[in-house]
């Protein structure tokens, strides 16, 4: 293939980026001087300092935060905790819990966003109750919790066909660590362990598709320069996570989250939608900085689209409002269902956004502290189904 044919495979913006990269490398090599005199060192340092800014900015453009950066998932992990209990037999689905707004675990008083009082298992997901999740984690036990966390893909590679996927094995606990009751309690509602957005999206897909964990991929097909198909990239099921029955139950719980729980702003007329909000306190906890998110899907009975939106430290006076992420996810979904040709299921207006319905906040608050090196980048939003916008890293919270 000649150069002209090769370049025809790329857009002009991609070609410009490749040219820029070549120029960057040439500039970098040009600054590597063999002159070790003091004057030369000072001069070279000035040049390299200036150019390093350019290099760093350029490299950031090529960083895929969805697979390279990690954060605590927050309450978007709660459906996994419930699915673990249902699948393992630790839960029957008929459980009730009593939430006083906090739970004393050892010597730590770990909070919930509201005083929920008596609450069913389904409502514990819909209303995002930390107290219920902690009790569920204790009922499952450390071994079962860790086993299913691994099955769902947390702490292991997704196998996506992209370079630069972060190794997160050290960012989750093992079964022996979960013998600490506080660790198990906070992990049950999505804090004190880290994951990438792709890990969350891939695992979540298995929750709602009947329990099949597919290898995520970007490339659908490889063609030759004359358009002939060289290779088709088909679907690859890596493992089974949960049963069809458990998956159907979890979908119904998350549909209620959108209908009457913390995700009501995700409603779109004519579409059945399920989802889960997330509001994770970042470290240090006392700074009250938050990583908010919403992961939603449609249709509920036979999901065709999943969108995961995150906002790191939203630029508002009250950050712990997952409704901001819900609204963004809804805007994305309204456009994407048209692009993908996903038709409305009904003209019933009962599942539309009610402007008078107050969006409940979903705060996975905890009084526990952990050491962390945190890289912050405020006001950044990403969707796993659309182009990523600089979703920054919040280092391992252990």
Predicted features along the sequence, with ranges:
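Beta-lactam-recognizing serine transpeptidase/beta-lactamase-like catalytic domain environment
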Residues: 1-75, 80-311, 393, 397-398
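Polycationic, low-complexity disordered segments in secreted or periplasmic proteins
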Residues: 373-394
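Short, well-ordered alpha-helical segments
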Residues: 244, 248, 323-331
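Short, gly/Ser/Thr-rich active-site loops of penicillin-recognizing serine hydrolases
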Residues: 229-234, 326-380
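A short acidic/glycine-rich loop-to-helix N-cap element
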Residues: 313-324
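A periodicity- and composition-biased signal for non-globular, repetitive helical segments
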Residues: 282, 365-366, 382-385
